[in-house]
Amino acid sequence: MRYCAFRLGLFFIGYSCCVLLSTPTLASSLEKSDAESTQTEQWNSNGKRILEADDPKLSLEGERGITPEVVPAFEAIGKAKTPEKAVPRMSLRSKLNPVNWAKGLWFKLRQLRARYRAWRLRRIIADKRGLGPALLNGLTPLHVKNVKDETIRYSKFGPDAINQIEKDYDSFVKLYFAQFDGLHKDPPIVKMDILDKMVKEMSSIERLAVRTSLDRVRLTVDAGYSFEKLISLDVSPLLYMRLLDAEGAFSDVDKNRDAINHLKGYVKAYYKHITL
């Protein structure tokens, strides 16, 4: 029994050695490829040059298809599975960067602010009495323009929605500056009867808010600021005109010519600023 086991073991050892010796090694493969690559140029019996596999002209002029030997390799690459949660190194580093966190938080805050301002503006404009109360409280085209730009920037609107927003804004600007058509006549014709009637119909709290807005405009104008400064403070041109009307400037045009001309200049500068 031991003798049979010994002979069987010798048989397996011999078989393994034969298989090992018959398999080409990496070194022999490299030597063979080097030997074949050195013979890149041969001549046939007719004196014509024969191109071998390593010749660059053959690779350019020969067939460009995939050989049958390479097909299984490409199929194996196609079937190879990659990790589902593989994250690029730069992407992971970018996500862990505190600066990017701060930028993302700042963007979210600006987005929330833009949405709140747009919501608040819609509520103001949706008043059943129209735009009158909003204008009396200091609503200006510059404020509407800022809200419009923020809404477009921080919201995902399509081209049609953006065009509609722009049209609504242009309509508001046209309606707003139509109130100054009589200002440029000689003598100026300013009609505040509709707004004055609207103020009388307001509640006590609403009238207090309108008076506060008018007093704020008076203090700013009396400070003697330039047009650029007044625009940066977003002083309402309509409330400025209403202030001069309340002070009786249009009742005596010759006496208040400088104040009226200053208002005309400010309206012109304001319109130019928002239409740039």
From Swiss-Prot:
Annotated Gene Ontology cellular components are: extracellular region; host cell plasma membrane; membrane
* Signal peptide residue numbers: 1-27
What's the source species for this entry?
Plasmopara viticola
Q: Where in the cell is it found?
A: Secreted; Host cell membrane
Q: Which domain of life is it from?
A: Eukaryota
The family this protein is said to belong to: Belongs to the RxLR effector family.
Key words, A-Z: Host cell membrane, Host membrane, Membrane, Secreted, Signal, Virulence
Per the record, the major location class is secreted
Q: Where is this motif: RxLR?
A: 110-113
Q: What does this protein do?
A: Secreted effector that partially suppresses the host cell death induced by cell death-inducing proteins.
Q: What is known of its domains?
A: Has the canonical translocation RxLR motif, but lacks the canonical EER motif, which characterizes most oomycete effectors identified so far.
Entry protein name = Secreted RxLR effector protein 85
